[in-house]
């Protein structure tokens, strides 16, 4: 009995350590439509996660809006005020597409211009699986673990062209705050 315990106990601790190591940083995005909990994958997207968290920690996203909403595609935010004015962002980061993470429903990825290494603060959350975005090298860095119904609600709002931005919600969908989740 003691010999079995001596073998099993280290195994239990080792498995617990692996589980802890695999858990990524979690953030809670409070929006005017509800909360979205997102797990970030530091192991596969360290540059994107570090960049995103630098904006989170600076409270940059507080008061910004989802400015591009396309049902059956994605919801995009993280850079514009409710008046559709772009906030000044930090320099762009290196693209981490091809890291094994896919643009599947509920994944969060860096929005960018045509230039591969042009992502700054803006991100999008996939409303559906979008494998074409993997081919186009859009870098995923996490996934929604709670609140996918909020993503669905945001994707369902009426949109139009507002101040030159197509697919903008007619009523602003505000990102109230994004914070690191409390660890237990």
Regions found by a protein language model. Give the residues of each.
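Bacterial N-terminal signal peptides that target proteins for export
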Residues: 1-9
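Cyclophilin-like peptidyl-prolyl cis-trans isomerases
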Residues: 12-184
